[in-house]
């Protein structure tokens, strides 16, 4: 059992009614009067629906045991993404609504980890940084420096990242997947 105050983004727990829930955001909130509450943005792993809720810090939940298996992202068709286990060559289908954020960071043939809850495939774990190519951005301004405010750049996967002014279309960049931010040129 884990207390609500210990839940952090990325953790998965099971509710009393059997729902498998992943924490997207968690924060302590202390109103002017009264007790502290935990405000959370959560996703139902099975349905993909997201919702906001609050818990008392002492409320307890059953932490879900999630296992991971190395896999390769094959392709996306309609509303399904296809992955292949690197060891057994088994193929897995995951509804894109459950992993739409992760799909912004991976290309076909990328190495990922498939997440299992028992025998049920529930998600994808991606690396902490990835290399993506800039598909489109505003032209560079002559004399631009690193200290500028930056500009938006659309990556080859559709992800939009704020990048320094000197970045041009076609360049490979290292992107932090946890925050969706530019790290460096590749």
From Swiss-Prot:
Cellular-component GO terms for this entry: cytoplasm
Recorded metabolic or biological pathway in which this protein acts: Protein biosynthesis; polypeptide chain elongation
Taxonomic superkingdom: Bacteria
Family, as annotated: Belongs to the elongation factor P family.
InterPro entries: Elong-fact-P_C, NA-bd_OB-fold, Rib_uL2_dom2, Transl_elong_fac_P/YeiP, Transl_elong_KOW-like, Transl_elong_P/YeiP_cen, Transl_elong_P/YeiP_CS, Transl_elongation_fac_P
Name of this protein: Elongation factor P
SMART domains cross-referenced by the UniProt entry: EFP (SM01185), Elong-fact-P_C (SM00841)
Annotated function: Involved in peptide bond synthesis. Stimulates efficient translation and peptide-bond synthesis on native or reconstituted 70S ribosomes in vitro. Probably functions indirectly by altering the affinity of the ribosome for aminoacyl-tRNA, thus increasing their reactivity as acceptors for peptidyl transferase.
PANTHER family: ELONGATION FACTOR P (PTHR30053), ELONGATION FACTOR P (EF-P) FAMILY PROTEIN (PTHR30053:SF12)
Molecular function GO terms recorded: translation elongation factor activity
Subcellular location: Cytoplasm
GO biological process: peptide biosynthetic process
Keywords in alphabetical order: Cytoplasm, Elongation factor, Protein biosynthesis
Protein's organism: Streptococcus agalactiae serotype V (strain ATCC BAA-611 / 2603 V/R)
HAMAP family, alphabetized: EF_P (MF_00141)
Chain ranges passing through the membrane: none
């Amino acid at each position: 059992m884990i207390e609500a105050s210990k839940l952090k983004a990325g953790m998965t727990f099971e509710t009393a009614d059997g729902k498998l829930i992943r924490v997207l955001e968690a924060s302590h909130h202390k109103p002017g009067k009264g007790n502290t509450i935990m405000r959370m943005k959560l996703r139902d792993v099975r349905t993909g629906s997201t919702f906001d809720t609050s818990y008392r810090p002492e409320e307890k939940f059953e932490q879900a045991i999630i296992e991971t298996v190395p896999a390769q992202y094959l392709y996306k068709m309609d509303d399904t993404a296809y992955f292949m286990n690197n060891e057994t060559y088994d193929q897995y289908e995951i509804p894109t609504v459950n992993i739409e954020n992760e799909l912004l960071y991976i290309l076909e043939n990328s190495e990922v980890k498939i997440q299992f809850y028992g025998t049920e495939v529930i998600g994808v774990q991606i690396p902490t940084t990835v290399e993506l190519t800039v598909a489109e951005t505003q032209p560079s301004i002559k004399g631009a420096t690193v200290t500028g405010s930056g500009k938006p750049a659309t990556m080859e996967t559709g992800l939009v990242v704020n990048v320094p002014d000197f970045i041009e279309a076609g360049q490979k960049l290292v992107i932090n997947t946890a925050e969706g931010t530019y790290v460096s040129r590749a």
